[in-house]
Swiss-Prot record:
Gene that produces this protein: ldh1
Matching Gene3D superfamilies: Lactate dehydrogenase/glycoside hydrolase, family 4, C-terminal, NAD(P)-binding Rossmann-like Domain
Keyword Phosphoprotein included in the entry's annotation: yes
The protein's role, per its UniProt record: Catalyzes the conversion of lactate to pyruvate.
Subcellular location per the Swiss-Prot or TrEMBL entry: Cytoplasm
Protein's name according to its UniProt entry: L-lactate dehydrogenase 1
Amino acid sequence: MKDHQKIILVGDGAVGSSYAFACVNLSIGQEFGIIDIDKDRTIGDAMDLSHAVPFSTPKKIYSANYSDCHDADLVVVTAGTAQKPGETRLDLVNRNIKIMKGIVDEVMASGFDGIFLIASNPVDILTYATWKFSGLPKERVIGSGTSLDTARFRMSIADYLKVDARNVHGYILGEHGDTEFPAWSHTTVGGLPITEWISEDEQGAMDTIFVSVRDAAYEIINKKGATFYGVAAALARITKAILNNENAILPLSVYLDGHYGMNDIYIGAPAVVNRQGVRHIVEMNLNDKEKEQMKNSADTLKKVLDDAMKQID
């Protein structure tokens, strides 16, 4: 593992700048370049972020060009059209897949041979597209997937039970979007199954918890226009796991090749990640209902993906 850790961020909007700030605060990486169509904004953000460095650890932060990607360990993409009130993430695909192709072509032209981390929506489809456009191994193209959804899930359960969210373990699987679902059969609190904390009489509470998680982004968008702090924190966590070679298990958008009975698709599932990217996909033993939900989520993504890729071919 080389000592110098270099990150290039493509997309300096609300998510991108929040991610950059999180990396500064959490002392992630030693070099951080920022690319955006608005060059002045990247210059201003690099200056502003640099002034936070004395409160953290040394880091070089600058306005970058695509040529700077050539020796980056990680290229993180948050660029794209934002989700509007009333829009689903899948509604964004036609606009954002063309933007993504342009970005990936520029990055690869630099000689980049690191790891892509995609956060632009719809993230599962754009991660698949990035893999196709880049020609990189599937292990080195990763999407943020259901990492934020899972954090919301754990927090909501913790709030309901009045426990620390760090003692809640469970995953949201599938699409980062409307067809996602909770793997209740593998959700534990303090080592005990969730069913030992929430009785059958409280089934409605479990349903309410999930709906609040699934629809959280819509509520935030309606109230403040966009979500960015949560996903920025999720990206920072993934970045740390990769650069520090943690072999951490995180719920990401990863390529399934027979896992969960799925093939040729990027979708949210737990995976072991380290400096080489995805080391291993954790295949949970889902119950029949969850298997059907996973299939439904994959089928929904496949249909949109096939239509979107035809635009580019």
